[in-house]
Design a protein with these regions (language model features):
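C-terminal ends and interior cores of transmembrane alpha-helices
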Residues: 96-111, 324-337
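Cytosolic juxtamembrane N-terminal segment immediately preceding the first transmembrane helix
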Residues: 1-31, 35, 51, 244
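Extracytoplasmic gate region of multi-pass secondary transporters
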Residues: 42-46, 166-167, 171-175, 245-293
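Extracytoplasmic
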Residues: 23-53, 135-136, 170, 269-277
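Hydrophobic core of transmembrane alpha-helices in multi-pass small-molecule transporters
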Residues: 113-131, 340-355
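Central cavity-lining transmembrane alpha-helices of secondary-active solute carriers
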Residues: 62-80, 293-305
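Helix-to-loop junctions at the C-terminal end of transmembrane segments
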Residues: 74-87, 174, 302-314, 396-397
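Intracellular juxtamembrane helix-capping segments at the cytosolic ends
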Residues: 130-144, 353-368
Length: 434
């Protein structure tokens, strides 16, 4: 990776002011945990709101769509704020939106309107867009360029920790375990049905209210903390940054495409985990939520393991190997029965854990003064998480089998194989030419 003036400034700052940077870096790392936490409540919300509002798989997938459309809509504004006002401003805006959106779950639950929940999720996701657009590149530049991918994987490991904690400990608070059939609901009189739906919807209020207050408290702490905002270019370099300039990079173009399909795959696999566990393995939703916690734990362990393995195997090769393994695991999940399906999904989580940060780091490699623009464009590609889960839901509704829908993440991993192979081939050719 070519050193830029940005990286030289960062290295100097790290060596000269590491004590001053220690607390701010802890705060930034905590952001990875918090957005991972709220993202991994979505697979709990999907079966919960599907039950509360009697939704089809396609309708319940709109939860993911409302979240990831926000990434597409807000990535460019987030990038503009960072370029004009710096990383800290982007982080603060993100935290305020995140906190307010979480608190809005209280009136959404009181209203018993599905669209209000989607609106609150959209606001949360707008905040997450600012956070991810700022924090991901921030971590890659705070240290040697040669270890940027490993460093981002390590920070994202705390995202994986949240992927275990959220479903394992908050999931049982939200999921009541009451699974009434449509016939049982039809047999209720109006007051009984209203009270049942109100009880189901109300279980989300306290977790999201507490989360929102914590996020706003973090925003206050960061506001009063001196956050290093190392400039990645001089004024002339900043004026030269452009979308067309950034998109001239084949690495960035490939990263955008790969990230679109990766996020689509991750959301598909995770969001329908409970539906898969309850149908293929016949377990109750409360038990499925516990296994979703193991899914998150595997994701976290995969991040830590991947960070370690990258000391010995280059990132492109490891990404290629993991994508190939996940293709085989998707075949197993589609055709398997019983607990083998659940174990297959958990294994997919382990092997897809390194993909987001690895693709992200590869995509913005060598962008120089276009790094912030490139970061925004890759974050925009997260819209794959909005567009691909409804395809899975539609296949499930049409065929009557949720397992058939997992052809969608399988094809996503095929795209990632092509991306990783192309990047590895390019790296080998570059090394041969040196």
């Amino acid at each position: 990776m070519t050193k830029t003036p940005h990286q030289d400034a960062v290295n100097e700052a790290v060596s000269n002011g590491s004590r001053k940077m220690f607390f701010p870096l802890i705060l930034v790392t905590s952001l990875f945990f918090f957005w991972g936490f709220v993202h991994n409540l979505d697979p709990i919300l999907i079966p919960h709101l599907r039950k509360a509002f009697n939704l089809s798989d396609l309708e319940s997938s709109l939860i993911d769509s409302s979240v990831f459309i926000a990434y597409f809509a807000m990535a460019l504004p987030a990038g503009y704020v960072m370029r004009k006002y710096g990383y800290k401003s982007g982080i603060l805006i993100g935290l305020v939106l995140f906190g307010l959106g979480s608190i809005l779950f209280v009136p959404a639950a009181n209203s018993l309107q599905y669209m209000y929940f989607l609106g609150a999720l959209f606001i949360i996701a707008c905040g997450l867009t600012f956070l991810e657009t700022a924090a991901n590149p921030y971590v890659t530049i705070l240290g040697p360029a040669s270890t940027a991918t490993r460093r981002l994987n390590f920070s994202q490991s705390f995202n994986g920790l949240a992927a275990y904690i959220a479903p394992a400990y908050i999931g049982p608070m939200i999921l009541s375990g009451k699974n009434l059939t449509q016939a049982e609901m039809d047999g209720m009189n109006a007051p009984e049905l209203h009270n049942y739906l109100l009880e189901e919807a109300a279980s989300v209020k306290m977790p999201y209210l507490v989360l929102g207050l914590i996020i706003l408290a973090v925003a206050v702490i960061i506001y009063f903390t001196a956050m290093p905002d190392i400039k990645d270019e001089d004024k002339e370099g900043a004026d030269g940054a452009s979308f067309t300039g950034a998109l001239k990079s084949g690495k960035l173009r490939g990263g955008i495409i790969a990230q679109f399909f990766y996020v689509g795959a991750q959301v598909c696999v995770g969001s329908f985990f409970i539906k898969m566990a309850t149908t293929a393995a016949g377990m109750g939703e409360d038990s499925a939520a516990k296994y979703l916690g193991f899914f998150g734990l595997a994701f976290m362990l995969g991040r830590f393991a991947g960070t370690f393995i990258m000391k010995y195997i280059d990132a492109q090769k490891l990404l290629l190997i993991y994508a190939l393994i996940n293709i085989l695991l998707c075949v197993l999940v589609i055709n398997g029965t019983g607990m083998i399906v659940v174990y297959g999904l958990i294994a997919i989580a382990f092997f897809m854990s390194i993909m987001f940060p690895t693709i992200f780091s590869m995509g913005i490699e060598d962008l120089g003064h276009n790094t912030k623009i490139g970061s925004s464009l890759i974050v925009m590609s997260i819209v794959g998480g909005a567009l691909l889960p409804p395809v899975l839901g539609m296949i499930s509704d049409k065929t009557g089998s949720i397992q058939n829908g997992y052809i969608v993440p399988l094809m996503c991993f095929v795209v990632i194989v092509f991306f990783a192979f192309a990047r590895r081939k390019n790296r080998i050719n570059n090394n041969a030419g040196e």
